């Protein structure tokens, strides 16, 4: 059975109570997304209002496909609370949470990872985090968080 869409659920547990619980919808094919939204060229997409959302869609789809191609279930969630604090992806593996933020920037700031601390209220352990972005090389923000170029995904 082939799927065209990904339904991403919010991460929740008893300690995190102020969640927005609406699921998110992503497409496996970003080319189809661009066609449906009438973004007809790379230049139009790059300067358009949806460029960040398309990048998030791409990264979510690629991470999910990587898990599925390895025969694993991707335990992928997102976090958004009523104060509009958001984590784009939370990967859960063996009870450990790995937060991922996605930004269409070549120089993401360390302020992006502050929201990761919200997961410390969870009963699950928080581990390494990442900011996936347009920076050309892999680097570290600090000992626990990395900057990952989108081309690595």
Which residues does each PLM region occupy?
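Accessory nucleic acid-recognition modules appended to NTPase machines
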Residues: 1-97
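Short conserved micro-motifs at the rims of enzyme active sites and ligand-binding pockets
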Residues: 37-39, 101, 111-112, 141-143
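Arginine/glycine-rich "motif VI" loop of SF2 helicases in the C-terminal RecA-like domain
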Residues: 68-69, 117-126
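Conserved beta-strand segments of alpha/beta enzyme cores
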Residues: 75, 128, 144-146
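Active-site ExK catalytic segment of metal-dependent nucleases
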Residues: 92, 99-107
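Active-site-adjacent loop/helix micro-motif of nuclease/hydrolase catalytic cores
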Residues: 106-115
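Short, hydrophobic beta-strand segments that form beta-sheet elements in well-ordered domains
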Residues: 125-133
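Domain-level recognition of nuclease-like catalytic cores that cleave nucleotide substrates
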Residues: 135-153
């Amino acid at each position: 059975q082939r799927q065209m869409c990904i339904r991403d659920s919010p991460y929740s547990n008893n300690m995190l109570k102020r969640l927005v619980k609406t699921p998110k919808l992503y497409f496996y094919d970003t080319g189809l997304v661009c066609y449906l939204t009438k973004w007809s060229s790379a230049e139009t997409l790059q300067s358009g209002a949806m460029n960040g959302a398309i990048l998030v869609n791409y990264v979510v789809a690629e991470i999910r496909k990587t898990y599925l191609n390895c025969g694993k279930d991707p335990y992928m969630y997102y976090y958004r609370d009523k104060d509009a604090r958001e984590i784009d992806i939370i990967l859960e593996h063996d009870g450990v949470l790995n937060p991922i933020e996605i930004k269409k920037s070549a120089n993401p700031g360390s302020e992006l990872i502050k929201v990761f601390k919200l997961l410390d209220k969870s009963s699950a352990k928080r581990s390494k985090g990442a900011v996936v972005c347009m920076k050309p090389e892999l680097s570290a923000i600090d000992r626990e968080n990395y900057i990952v170029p989108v081309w690595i995904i």
